[in-house]
A protein has these predicted regions:
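Conserved short alpha-helical segments that host acidic/polar catalytic motifs at enzyme active sites
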Residues: 1-200
């Protein structure tokens, strides 16, 4: 089953996490690149001109702001992070940013998906489509995922990882995520006391 972009948010006995996967049929020549406080989705070497074909293929997919990790499938990662940095709650930052930026104005009306998790275990996940906006709380000790296609409502999922590398690997092709086609690249942030970032 093809779900497009996928993200997961939650916590387990080892810590809190956000994870992101690019699945793509149109622009498969992308990679994730880690920086000290963020992970970006960028074209692979030799495909830099793809950004002129679509404004939606290069963006920060994860950003760390204070004690919160933000994850999304587009430029709204930065908007959400900036709202949280200004003092807004996670729930309100997700809701306002998704509502303001709306779904992507491409041929597919691609939804914007987003999530965030704080070191205290508070986590939210959300989506905006052409006909709905959802922001749900993820209970402590649980994980939920959402995707741009097919699975456009938050779904509880067993997510097995003890660090950021394992979280990135898990959303790429482990557990339930192994059933979803066209994986391209993935990334994750994981924290027990401090956020660490990994990308594949």
């Amino acid at each position: 089953m093809y779900l497009g972009r996928i993200l997961a948010v939650g916590s387990n006995n080892e810590g809190n996490f956000v994870a992101y996967r690019v699945s793509s049929r149109s622009f498969p020549n992308r990679m994730t690149k880690s920086f000290p406080e963020s992970v970006a989705v960028v074209p692979k070497e030799g495909f830099e001109k793809d950004i002129y074909k679509s404004p939606y293929i290069a963006y920060n997919c994860i950003r760390i702001v204070d004690d919160v990790a933000v994850v999304s499938n587009g430029s709204h990662t930065d908007v959400i992070a900036e709202k949280i940095a200004s003092g807004m709650t996670i729930r309100d930052a997700l809701a306002l940013s998704l509502l303001t930026m709306d779904y992507e104005k491409d041929d597919f009306q691609t939804p914007r998906i987003a999530g965030a998790s704080a070191l205290n275990g508070e986590s939210y996940i959300g989506i905006v489509t052409a006909d709905k906006v959802i922001v749900d709380k993820v209970p402590p000790g649980e994980a939920s995922y959402i995707a741009t296609y097919e699975h456009t409502y938050p779904q509880k999922v067993d997510f097995e990882a003890v660090n950021s590398s394992e979280a990135a690997e898990f959303i790429m092709d482990k557990g339930k995520f192994s059933k979803f086609t066209n994986p391209v690249t993935s990334a994750a942030a994981f924290a027990s006391e401090k956020w660490e970032l990994s990308s594949i």
